[in-house]
Every structure is written in C-alpha cells, then in structure tokens.
Amino acid sequence: DLDPDDLSEKIRAHLDAHGYGDIGIEVLMNVTSSTLSVQDPLAKAGIRVLEDWGIEPVIWPRKGASGPPGYFSTLLGLNVLSSTGIGHATGHGSPDEFLVIEGDGKVGGLIELEQSYVDLLYSYANYPNEY
C-alpha cells in the first residue's frame, strides 16, 4: 500500500542522504495501486466466468505497475478488476502494448475477449445467482 507522494519523499531523502542532492526528481504522474480481494463479488464473478469458459484462473493480487485501475478506483471509489478476460494482451499504456486479434483455438482473440467481458457484466449483475 505505497502512497505515491510518500514514496517520492523517501526517494528524495535517500538521494540526499547519499550525497545526490543535485539529482532532480520530476513526478510526471502518481497513481495509487489497486487491489481487490478474491472474496469480493466482482472478483468472484470474474473467476466464475473464466471457470465457465474452462479456464483455470490465475490470480495476481497486485500488479507491478500503477495505471488506469488504480486511478479509476481512487477517482470513482469503485472496485476495479483489471487484466481479466479471455484472450491475450499485456503492457497497457506502454510502448509494447499488444492484443491478439484473431485467436487460434488455444489463445483467444478479440471476439473471445469481448464475449468474456459481456459474460463478466452478466455474471456480476446476477451474482451470486447464475447468469
């Protein structure tokens, strides 16, 4: 649960303590991280969709980067489920971001990704009942 402002201050203090006061720090953006309990209804709805698709969920409680999930979670006060869906993509907001467009039966593509999002909306709207 790192606070971006607190972290910036700690980095500044560390640099100063080691004789690097001449190094400037320019914060371009600071976004808090987000986390969601696997017991949260949104997470359970997402897990249910993956299992219904025959996919064993891989759960990462935290990601190694900040980004839109943390921003919108803080801004709107909502729980955010990130990096979910059928298909393969990674690197959101980075120069090497990608998304598989056409699945090959082993890896889902854009159509499967979109359908899994629709399933997630239905699953969450009806949770804990069947969707």
Short names for language-model regions:
Residues 20-26, 126-131:
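Flexible, glycine/charged-enriched surface loops at secondary-structure junctions
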Residues 1-3:
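Long hydrophobic segments that form regular secondary structure
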Residues 34-52:
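Short, low-order "capping/linker" segments at domain edges
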Residues 23-39, 62-64:
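A short beta-alpha structural unit
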Residues 7-15:
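Short amphipathic alpha-helices in soluble, non-transmembrane regions
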Residues 18-22, 50-56:
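Short secondary-structure junctions
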Residues 55-127:
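Zn-dependent metallopeptidase/amidohydrolase metal-coordination segment
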Residues 12, 46-47, 69:
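Generic structural marker for isolated residues within well-ordered, non-membrane alpha-helices
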